[in-house]
Amino acid sequence: MGARASVLSGGKLDAWEKIRLRPGGKKKYRLKHLVWASRELERFALNPGLLETPEGCLQIIEQIQPAIKTGTEELKSLFNLVAVLYCVHRKIDVKDTKEALDKIEEIQNKSQQKTQQAAADKEKDNKVSQNYPIVQNAQGQMVHQAISPRTLNAWVKVVEEKAFSPEVIPMFSALSEGATPQDLNAMLNTVGGHQAAMQMLKDTINEEAAEWDRVHPVHAGPIPPGQMREPRGSDIAGTTSTLQEQIAWMTGNPAIPVGDIYKRWIILGLNKIVRMYSPVSILDIKQGPKEPFRDYVDRFFKTLRAEQATQDVKNWMTETLLVQNANPDCKTILRALGQGASIEEMMTACQGVGGPSHKARVLAEAMSQVTNTNTAIMMQKGNFKGQRKFVKCFNCGKEGHIARNCRAPRKKGCWKCGREGHQMKDCTERQAKFFRENLAFQQREARKFSPEQARTNSPTSRELRVRRGDDPLSEAGAAEGQGTSLSFPQITLWQRPLVTVKIEGQLREALLDTGADDTVLEEINLPGKWKPKMIGGIGGFIKVRQYEQVAIEICGKKAIGTVLVGPTPVNIIGRNILTQIGCTLNFPISPIETVPVKLKPGMDGPKVKQWPLTEEKIKALTEICTEMEKEGKISRIGPENPYSTPIFAIKKKDSTKWRKLVDFRELNKRTQDFWEVQLGIPHPAGLKKKKSVSVLDVGDAYFSVPLDKEFRKYTAFTIPSINNETPGIRYQYNVLPQGWKGSPAIFQSSMTKILAPFREQNPEMVIYQYMDDLYVGSDLEIGQHRAKIEELRAHLLKWGFTTPDKKHQKEPPFLWMGYELHPDKWTVQTVKLPEKDSWTVNDIQKLVGKLNWASQIYPNIKVKQLCKLLRGAKALTDIIPLTKEAELELAENREILREPIHGVYYDPSKDLIAEIRKQGQGQWTYQIYQEPFKNLKTGKYAKMRTAHTNDIKQLTEAVQKISTESIVIWGKIPKFRLPIQKETWETWWTEYWQATWIPEWEFVNTPHLVKLWYQLETEPIAGAETYYIDGAANRETKLGKAGYVTDRGKQKVVSLTETTNQKTELQAIYLALQDSGLEVNIVTDSQYALGIIQAQPDKSESELVNQIIEELIKKEKVYLSWVPAHKGIGGNEQVDKLVSSGVRKVLFLDGIDKAQEEHERYHNNWRAVASDFNLPPIVAKEIVASCDKCQLKGEAMHGQVDCSPGIWQLDCTHLEGQVILVAVHVASGYIEAEVIPAETGKETAYFLLKLASRWPVKVIHTDNGSNFTSAAVKAACWWADIQQEFGIPYNPQSQGVVESMNKELKKIIGQVRDQAEHLKTAVQMAVFIHNFKRKGGIGGYSAGERIIDIIATDIQTKELQKQISNIQKFRVYYRDSRDPIWKGPAKLLWKGEGAVVIQDNSEIKVVPRREAKIIRDYGKQMAGDDCVASRQDED
């Protein structure tokens, strides 16, 4: 560290530590930043010594600067640090990083001209090239020095470790400094195994080479003598030029830097590859259920910076996607904050919010009163009939449970003889001799388990075990027992438990019988007196002699008791002796199958150092871990495990006990992702009414499930010692740890598998499972129901899951998942709003959480005003004064919660009805019921998805939200009762350009009816004045103009400041509305303004739009039309010139007429128009929008579908009384469609076979129509090896892709229908247009191009996988020039013409082909002295 920290010294270091990281920030640069920068430079193969001089800093800046745009945050931080360091070296006074960057930019701009002039002078002087690969020999000739294996090795390492992440580009730039095209090709060949990436790179090089040839045409005529030919594109790429030609071009006068040109092409290709290999889209950034909001915002903006989009689009993404992709808890608060909230306000409002922990806090407070009451009642009901006798487990040594309930692991090995290496069925021992040492007897320590032991190794049979009982022995027995090493036999019941026993010194073979009361032996001579007795058995009564005080020894354990001697068919040791020696009948826990877990590819386990802990925390952790080790939950490990995760301890709430916490954040980052088994919590409104109900809780849920053996090493942690007195104690987990990301998913999956057999055997039992909470309901009588519950508990216990009695709820009301369940109704657990004189931010957050929870059954609850209080950057402890509106809202909510409200249970035989009511201020409430005044569920909706909206749009959004919620809870959509008249709805619906599906509904006359405040005409108004409006603004000066020209000669222009083009267009509409009569025609060339007004908003966040709405309401009739700009339309051209004067430059474009002509024929979308005719997107959109057939509706809104190349969706749609069968390739959007004679299975199967003969079809997804479920379709699927999947009934979203394509196809058919006589012709024309004349989506392709690209890529990927698997069958023996001894075998990674890339242990090397021998790996074989690597067959 000393060497690295010596970059600055004395006064320079003082100056360095005064510079701030950010303008106005508190943090300043420190010495540690220089140490970090040195390490980063080593990673990028740059010399850290360059930091010591200003010249070196400039060199680093020149290397890093080209990669800043695509680089990571670490790369940008490194660039900023070097810029500041340069200023310190040069003694340039800067206060923060931003000033330093400005200085660097200024210096670079000033020196640019000097550098160019110096370069020109250098060329004139014809000095020797100093480029590294081209050197001057002793004769003065320019010769090539081949790129070194060390450089190639470094490049291969970069690609293998970074996997084409953004850091690859600066590394390539640094390693290829001054290289010739031949050197660059050598570098590319060493990573040729990445075929997909290399193909992309090759395509980019070919495109750039073609562009070079186009820009540099060949000169006519022969080349003059002594003059070199000019390089073509293929010459620069090194394919048609020699090394000597490349050197001549690079060192000539004037020089043609073919190496640098080719390098630039490669970097362009690498940029494309980086984007492909790091496909992080802003749409994929979503907040996890437990992720803090601040972390989510950091990830969001990090990805946003990398997005290729304009600033306007990025602003829109911030306003819309940031809230949309937040988790439900944060989303509720963010939406209540409204559109105008800043990032700081959002982050303050969402402090400590989100995930189950937040819900738990809300529920815990709501339950506090109930829990306290119940605890008191339980204590009063306690039965204190006598002191309970404690039992002790002989498996782990702990008191309080017996061995069959023990969770500690069982010992491995044969269950009969105890030895490892074979199973019981292969055992040759005649009788059990499985002795365990260190019994858990009284006054003895529990046996220790080996670290690798786990429950997964436990036997699955019943077994008989012998242990020391509680009954006291005689003095002789006790004395003798104390001197004997006690052992522990374990006998399985696969065979009869026969053992050899010693009775008064005589050996006999006897059966251990736990069902027999007495010990009965065949004829044996025993000393002492006896008395006659008659005993009953299965075969009748027999006469026996009864001997008292007989000494018996069984498996080394002694007992004294009564023995009966008589004609018994087999010697029996009964319970009178077995209880003395502590024999028990055990039911070992069945093994739970472990789920295999891996780290993310290319990652290693966490190596985070343990931070120091206080003495009391170390003592607490030591005690906790000792207990956990005894129970088998964790195991001790040695120094061979290199991984580490920090642990700490906190005190439990309202307790003196400590709780162990493990900081698994680093491991969670490195662990593979898991699919959430359960996407939400079950809701009581979806429960069916049941006669009998029970609620169970699984104790120590995670610790009952074993962790994958191969993954355990990564959970290692250390308990340090005080003052480092001794090395820390190291442990690893054997079971699922708390806080690890995989625990919830694995536990849910394991629990589901375990419950599956019980569910199959007891279909009458309904089990709702969420984590460790179980709701069990049935229509059985209470006695039968409770018997089944005990069966379920026993079933769970067999797998190691205990269900504690204290959490077993048998009588209503049942407390479950935060709800209170009664036999015929349900409610949320008691919600009490606190009474406070002053409210902090944290108090209001908790209050909003409680109210949101209560709103699912209490109607009309509002939180908007309370959420407004959370705006602004405030700390959690800041006191917030309540506004009058918030106080009123809180008082109303208190009144609503005063009377308890209950919901009822679902009846499948009755219809669902959803009624929505408007509350005003953009807030809505809804009630879902089956009978009036008996609500199943209530809720509220207060979203404002766009800046300008109206009540009808909000109502539509609320309907869609309730539909989705209903499908999740009940599996069907309710009938809706909406506060809007049919006429109002139809008027808006037919005009609204982006209409979406909503279900069946009827009008309900409730207060706050929804209505349209104004209506736009569909045709021009005869006799009304026509206003041609326009607006323009200058982006730099923010100055603008808005105005109009009328058909009657009126005109007006106003000047505006601090405005934009969009604002001026809206201002022009406002001017026209202000100055016009009650009826007016308005013509605009702005799609933006037209889109806002045509949606008929009645409220907006924009003050200007609200003013426009007020003017529209005053008018009797308004007609608003759009015309394309700059097309010579009279009034539009006049007003354009009027407002453009001195503000903007008008751009006239060629190709518009051809684009319009093609659009009129094919009705292609705007992306295809822009691509085919090289037009800007805004012009292409205007052409499409001006088409009367394409202006009916907007384009479909695209979602995200996870799909593979072989999946197709099929559906039938109807048009003109005929059936059209449509097939859509999900991944590409490619369509195949035909008009079929009838909707039958036969026609469908024939269509499916035609589809399979043209395209690779692996899976088809259809609805449950009779033609798709027919035997003919099943037969076709069987023959063509196609898997058929079905959608969800009543759920249109399950067939979303094909449903969307049906609408799209019908729209295109409508556009071309007048060009065809028959429908079947129009269908094929529409399919052609969709597949080949509409571009967009992934890659900007048409659907036809995209499907071919996807299939070709799939084939290439499969071939690549085959090659990789084939090449891994070979091993390489190699040597280098310095050491003639052969080394190996190493793993073959890639084989080229002149060299091979190998992996020896963890090191990747490039070895010349002549120094390597490649040998097929035939597995492990015994090699003799004459078996030498060089004699084997080479590849």
UniProtKB/Swiss-Prot annotation:
Segments for region (Interaction with host AP3D1): 12-19
Region of interest: Interaction with membrane phosphatidylinositol 4,5-bisphosphate: 73-77
GO BP terms: DNA integration; DNA recombination; establishment of integrated proviral latency; proteolysis; symbiont entry into host cell; symbiont-mediated activation of host apoptosis; symbiont-mediated suppression of host gene expression; viral genome integration into host DNA
UniProt lineage: Viruses, Riboviria, Pararnavirae, Artverviricota, Revtraviricetes
Protein name, per record: Gag-Pol polyprotein
Region (Interaction with Gp41): 7-31
Signal peptide segment: none
Residue ranges of every copy of the Integrase catalytic domain listed in the record: 1201-1351
Zinc-finger ranges (CCHC-type): 391-408, 412-429
Locus of motif Tryptophan repeat motif: 985-1001
Gene symbol of the encoding locus: gag-pol
Motif segment (Nuclear localization signal): 26-32
Site (Essential for RT p66/p51 heterodimerization): 988, 1001
InterPro entries referenced in this protein's UniProt entry, alphabetically: Aspartic_peptidase_AS, DNA/RNA_pol_sf, Gag_p24_C, Integrase-like_N, Integrase_C_dom_sf_retrovir, Integrase_C_retrovir, Integrase_cat-core, Integrase_Zn-bd_dom_N
